[in-house]
Structures are given as C-alpha cells and as structure tokens.
C-alpha cells in the first residue's frame, strides 16, 4: 500500500502536465466544477500596434474566434502551448504565436518566463472580466511567423539534431542566426554564398592532405617489413606498391572532384535545401527589401526636390516681400508729398478766402441796405400816388415792382443757401473719401506688420 501511495504522488513542479496526462489517460473525466471554459481569440492582421506593442480592449469585438477550451485552472500557459493543437486542432492554430494578457484597458504580451508562472485561472473570473484567451500570431519582416519562445525551442532542437546518431543535421544555430542577420542586412546573403565554395574547397584540400599523410605512413610501415619478405617478394611488392600509389592518387583526385561537385551543388541548391524551410521565402524577402530600398531612394530624391523647390520659393518670397516693401514705401512717400501739397494749398486758399469772405459779407450787408431803401422808396411812392379808388391798387406798376424785388431777394437768399450747402456737402464727401483711404492704408499697414511679425517668429 505504501508503494502505491508513493506512485500516486504528483510532483508540485509538473502538476499542470500531470493533470493533462490524467485527463488524456483516464476515461472518467473530472467534474465540470474543476474545469474552466475559455474562449480563444486571434488578433487579426493589421490591428496590432507594433510601435506601442499593445492594443486596446475596445477592439476585442473584431478579434477572430478559434474555439473554446475546457481545461484545468491550474494549467500553465507553457503546458497549454504544447497541447493547444490537440484541443483546438492544428488547422485552427497558427504555427507560432504569443499569449496576451488583459491589464487595464489594453492587452500586453506575455513573455516566455511568465508563461511558466501564469495559470489559466488568471484568465477567467474573478481574476478577469471575461473567460477569454487572446493569441497574437507574430510575423517577421520576411513573412515568417515567429515568437521568442518558439525560436528558443528551435535552437534547442537544432543543438540536439546535430548530435543525432543518423548524422543528419536538421537546422544548426548558425542558420537561424544567419536568417536573423539576413533580415537586417541583405548583402550578407551574397557574401555567404560566395564564401561557401571556398570553404568546401578548403575542406576538400584538408581531406586530400590527410589521405596523403595516411598513404605515406602506410608506405613507411611497409618499408619496415622483414628482409626475408622483401627479398622473396621484391618484384611483386614493387608492382603492387606502384599500383597502390596510382590507385590512391586516382582516389584522391576523384575525391577532390566529388568534393568540388558537392560544394558546387550545395552552392547552387542552398535555397532549396530541406534543412532550410525558410530559404524560398528569403528570395521574396530580398525582393521586398530591394523594393523598399528603391522606394526609399525615390522618396529621398523627392524630398531633395521638395527641399530645393522650397528654398527656391523662399528666395522668391523674400524677393517679393522686398519689392512689396519698396513699393509700399514709395506709395507712402507719394501720399505724404500729395498730402503736404494739398495742405499747403488749403492753408493758402484759406488765407485768401478769409479776406474774400469779409468782402462778401460787406457786400451782402450793402445789398440788404440797398434792398431796404428801395422798398421804402417804393412804398412811399405808392402812398403818394394812391388813387381814390382802392380797387386799382393791385394793378399799379409800383406794386408790381415791389413784388418783383421781394421775389428776387428771396431767390438770391435761396441761391446763397444752396451754394453754402453745396460747399459743405463737397467738403464732407472729400473728408469721407480721405477717411476711407486712410482706413485702407492703415489696414494694409497692419496686415503687413502682422506678416512681418509672423515671419520673424517662424525664423
């Protein structure tokens, strides 16, 4: 009984893996209360923000569903990664992916060390809002899917593959490093392809020298044979020795040719080698990189052209600004001279008009006096010449003359008022026009000053 108890003990470190084994081996499934149902989602292409290395939870509705899982809550992400293809099917799962964890309002990438620590219960309530598991299939610049954990697993497998008994090398570490470096610098591909035949030739030369040294040792060993054998079989040994030397030389020449041919084959068939499944993608990646370089060169040329055009336009703008400033100063000087000329004329005419106005007022006063005297004389004459019949007073000539003089006086006064009103109106119109022109000039000056200040701030 003690032995059975010891056998049934489960180690603490491998508890999640043991639970998976028990689930797969035991026909009786555990109760549903011990399992957790998780909905698995994929992040679609183009939605992941590679600059910020995160994505908002508001875009979760656009994620692609891959199915759901019923697993133990104590299972770690590392163990789930190994068995995820069995739960959901290999077709529904990407070859290489990353787990995502909801923290706050964003999704964060789970690193390799955290995969062995995080358990699936942290992705279900009450630890999470929704029982959902998010996967991110990551694409490199050559179009291959990769993730930090799977790259490390590949390196471990390649290290183990080198030491296999069959002697077949699946994928050495240098190849993975070569692929990583080739994405950064495409010129490495040409250099490595050129160096491969040289290395193979050196190896072939080394093998040939080793075979020659072995032949020399055999010859020395054969020369140390007993004298009886040398005497008895001298002729036969000489012929055999010469034949062996010729055969060895032929073998070394053939081996050299074969090594060179194998090196050339490796040089030619390097992209189609079965141990490098990503080699066909390298050509497409190189073409993409070359296209990117050509596009970059085009963009750089366009940038240079735009800079030259900008400089040319800036020079033209500066010249135009200078010409505008000169024209503005010239127009300002013209206006100033015109203003001064009109001001002088106005003062001179004002001096003249003052004396003329005095003369005019005197003449008006004299005219009024003459008009009053004339009316008094006509009225006195009318009284003297008044007939006895009052009905004929309106028909007299004197009365008509009085009316004519009164009407003429009224007409003269109206003319004077009209002339004064005309003068006032003309002055007001001129003043208004002058005010409008001054306002326009002030506006243009203000706009120019604003432009100059803006340009000064920009510089």
Swiss-Prot record:
Compartments reported by the entry: Cytoplasmic vesicle, Secretory vesicle, Acrosome
GO CC annotations on file: acrosomal vesicle
Superkingdom of source: Eukaryota
Region (Disordered): 193-213
Coiled coil: 287-374, 400-453
InterPro entries to which the protein is assigned, alphabetical: SPAT1 (IPR039062), SPATA1_C (IPR031478)
Keywords: Coiled coil, Cytoplasmic vesicle
Major localization class: cytoplasm
Biased composition (Basic and acidic residues): 193-205
Assembly information from the UniProt record: Interacts with IFT20.
Protein name (database record): Spermatogenesis-associated protein 1
Organism field: Homo sapiens
Recorded name of the encoding gene: SPATA1
């Amino acid at each position: 009984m003690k032995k059975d108890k010891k056998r049934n003990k489960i180690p603490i470190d491998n508890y999640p893996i043991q639970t998976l084994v028990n689930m797969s081996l035991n026909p009786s499934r555990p109760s549903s209360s011990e399992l957790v149902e998780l909905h698995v989602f994929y992040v679609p292409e183009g939605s992941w923000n590679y600059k910020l290395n995160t994505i908002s939870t508001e875009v979760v509705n656009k994620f692609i569903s891959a199915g759901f899982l019923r697993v133990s809550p104590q299972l770690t992400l590392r163990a789930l990664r190994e068995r995820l293809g069995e739960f959901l099917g290999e077709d529904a799962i990407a070859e290489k992916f990353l787990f995502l964890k909801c923290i706050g309002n964003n999704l964060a990438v789970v690193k390799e060390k955290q995969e062995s620590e995080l358990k699936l219960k942290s992705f279900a309530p009450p630890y999470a809002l929704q029982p959902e598991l998010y996967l991110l299939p990551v694409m490199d610049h050559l179009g291959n899917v990769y993730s930090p954990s799977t790259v490390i697993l590949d390196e471990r497998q390649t290290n183990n593959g080198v030491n296999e008994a069959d002697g077949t090398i699946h994928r050495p570490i240098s190849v993975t490093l070569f692929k990583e470096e080739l994405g950064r610098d495409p010129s490495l591909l040409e250099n490595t392809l050129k160096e491969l035949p040289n290395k193979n030739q050196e190896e072939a030369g080394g093998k040939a020298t080793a075979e020659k040294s072995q032949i020399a040792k055999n010859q020395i060993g054969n020369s140390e044979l007993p004298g009886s054998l040398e005497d008895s079989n001298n002729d036969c040994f000489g012929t055999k020795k010469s034949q062996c030397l010729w055969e060895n030389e032929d073998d070394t020449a053939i081996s050299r040719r074969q090594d060179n041919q194998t090196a050339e084959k490796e040089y030619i068939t390097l992209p189609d080698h079965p141990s490098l499944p990503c080699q066909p993608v390298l050509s497409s990646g190189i073409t993409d990189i070359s296209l990117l370089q050509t596009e970059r060169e085009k963009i750089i040329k366009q940038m240079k052209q735009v800079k030259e055009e900008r400089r040319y336009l800036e020079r033209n703008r500066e010249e135009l600004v200078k010409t505008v400033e000169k024209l503005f100063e010239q127009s300002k000087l013209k206006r100033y001279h015109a203003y001064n000329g009109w001001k002088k004329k106005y003062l001179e005419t004002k001096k003249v008009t003052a004396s003329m106005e005095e003369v005019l007022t005197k003449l008006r006063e004299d005219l009024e006096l003459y008009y009053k005297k004339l009316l008094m004389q006509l009225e006195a004459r009318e009284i003297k010449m008044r007939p006895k019949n009052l009905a004929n007073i309106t028909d007299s000539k004197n009365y008509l003359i009085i009316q004519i003089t009164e009407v003429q006086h009224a007409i003269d006064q109206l003319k004077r008022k009209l002339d004064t009103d005309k003068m006032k109106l003309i002055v007001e119109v001129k003043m208004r026009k002058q005010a409008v022109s001054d306002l326009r000039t002030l506006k243009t000056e203000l706009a120019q000053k604003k432009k100059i200040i803006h340009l000064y701030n920009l510089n």
